[in-house]
């Protein structure tokens, strides 16, 4: 439980040298002058060589949550791993009725997972794949903040780490997560002044676009939109940039009209004002709102203190301008765009868009904070908040690990290769789904009959009617997860894992019968 506290103390030591100030510095060069004097690749090589020990140490620290439990508890991750196992069975000819498709997007993490599994096995591949995803997201955000401010955001690393382990990570949306991280790297290269005149650097940024698309299309949309906005904004005097924000808002509104007229759309259930970037830190319960509030207080005080201290410094506010404008536009998108978009007659939707967008908002807040002159109290305050956040996260993921161990014990009581359904509902105050712990524990033991990926028609594992391993109707899968799926004779034999008393973490297993609802005996507080 105290691992993360020691890690934060180490982070404090790493950041003391040559980055801490306690009094206003002499007037800085303008951000435009600094950008014009910088070439990305040589500057990056010099930076990495100079700070390689620090970079390695910080990388090791931010990966601690990937290794502090037996399993990484991150929503859809269990489903990703389970379907990687199904892919192995299909390749070996052991899963008739299932096939492997080759979608062009939303698949990069799955390819990474399967490729590593062939070398290291599934469980080790899971750790390596998630660790790589975290490093891509964290250092991508770090690079983007550096590009926006021409200053390495060492003192913001606790905040970046919290965002890296925020809602998007805990939901297990790793294809989207990697797409964002790669897009941050590309945008850092394309930031005005950093790659001007260097065709090689432009080529690197452009070459990332296909890789980002294979990860998730939203990453490409964000990258192109942000790069275009930044390029135009850099050519417009600051006093006119408010009109550019208005134009961007109009484009978002037109996109909303297009989506609503051509697709089936849904709105977010929660009030939209809650999705302000801080929601990325609200995970398994209301106590995370303490972390959100502390971060909000820090942001207000830190920016106010910086503005007051630098009020006589000509043009200091320009470093704030474009990151703040991008944040405002991202929040306009949160308010205007639908939460879910589905093609008519297609079973699965691109869902939770509102919540996903706040990952961008959170990183853009970090970019805004990067414009401040760094002061040692920034690191002290953020390290303290991060200690609270990661303590909560350790405790909650430890609880889910214990639930998963209970699932493992339950499925071991079954004959091999049985169909298993599960209805495990999260508490109302939690924003993170947990039902996919059953998927992971079925690997090599049973078949998670209600896993949503084969029936969705958008992932690489596809189920054909009459197969023994997976449901084929997406609506049936949704009903099963809610516990009101009526069992058919052809679904049997099958077993239900369910919450069996008022303690939502206590699980039981039982055989199912034809014509009964799968979660008939479930108890949900």
Briefly describe each language-model feature range.
Residues 171-178:
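Short acidic/glycine- and proline-prone juxtamembrane loop motifs at membrane-interface regions
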Residues 186-201:
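Membrane-interface transmembrane helices that cradle and orient dolichyl/undecaprenyl
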């Amino acid at each position: 439980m105290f691992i993360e506290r020691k890690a934060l103390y180490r982070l404090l030591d790493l950041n003391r040298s040559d980055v801490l100030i306690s009094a206003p510095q002499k007037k800085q060069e303008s951000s435009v002058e600094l950008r014009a004097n910088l070439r990305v690749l040589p500057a990056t090589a010099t930076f990495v060589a100079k700070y390689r020990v620090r970079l390695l140490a910080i990388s090791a620290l931010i990966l601690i949550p990937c290794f502090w439990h037996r399993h990484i508890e991150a929503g859809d991750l269990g489903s990703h791993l389970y379907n990687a196992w199904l892919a192995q069975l299909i390749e070996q000819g052991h899963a008739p009725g299932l096939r492997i498709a080759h979608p062009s997007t939303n698949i990069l993490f799955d390819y990474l997972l399967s490729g590593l599994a062939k070398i290291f096995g599934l469980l080790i591949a899971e750790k390596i794949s998630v660790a790589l995803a975290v490093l891509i997201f964290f250092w991508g955000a770090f690079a983007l903040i550096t590009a926006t401010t021409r200053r390495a955001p060492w003192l913001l690393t606790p905040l970046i780490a919290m965002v890296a382990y925020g809602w998007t990570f805990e939901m297990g949306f790793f294809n989207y997560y990697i797409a964002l991280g790669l897009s941050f790297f590309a945008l850092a290269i394309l930031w005005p002044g950093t790659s001007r005149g260097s065709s090689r650097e432009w080529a690197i940024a452009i070459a990332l676009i296909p890789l980002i698309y294979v990860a998730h299309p939203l990453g490409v949309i964000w990258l192109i939109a942000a790069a275009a906005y930044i390029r135009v904004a850099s050519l417009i005097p600051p006093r006119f940039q408010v009109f550019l924000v208005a134009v961007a808002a109009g484009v978002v509104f037109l996109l909303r009209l297009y989506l609503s007229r051509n697709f089936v759309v849904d709105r977010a259930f929660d009030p939209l004002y809650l999705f302000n970037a801080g929601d990325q830190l609200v995970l398994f319960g209301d106590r995370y709102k303490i972390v959100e509030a502390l971060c909000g207080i820090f942001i207000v005080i830190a920016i106010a203190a910086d503005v007051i201290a630098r009020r006589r410094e000509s043009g200091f506010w320009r470093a704030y301008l474009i990151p703040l404008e991008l944040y405002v536009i991202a929040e306009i998108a949160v308010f205007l765009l639908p939460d879910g978009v589905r093609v008519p007659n297609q079973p699965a939707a691109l869902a939770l868009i509102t919540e996903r967008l706040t990952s961008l908002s959170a990183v853009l807040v970090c970019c805004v904070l990067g414009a401040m002159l760094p002061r040692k109290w920034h690191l002290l305050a953020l390290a303290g908040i991060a200690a609270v956040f990661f303590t909560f996260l350790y405790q909650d993921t430890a609880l889910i690990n214990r639930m998963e161990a209970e699932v493992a014990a339950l499925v071991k009581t079954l004959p091999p290769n049985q169909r298993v359904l599960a209805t495990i509902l999260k508490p109302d105050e939690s924003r993170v789904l947990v039902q996919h712990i059953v998927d992971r524990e079925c690997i090599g033991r049973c078949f998670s009959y209600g896993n949503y990926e084969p029936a969705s028609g958008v992932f690489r594992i596809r189920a054909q009617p009459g197969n023994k391993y997976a449901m084929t109707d997406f609506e049936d899968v949704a009903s099963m997860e809610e516990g009101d799926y009526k069992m058919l004779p052809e679904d049997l034999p099958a077993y239900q894992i369910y919450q069996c008393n008022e303690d939502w973490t206590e699980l039981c297993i039982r055989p199912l019968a034809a014509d009964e609802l799968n979660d008939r005996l479930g108890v949900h507080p």
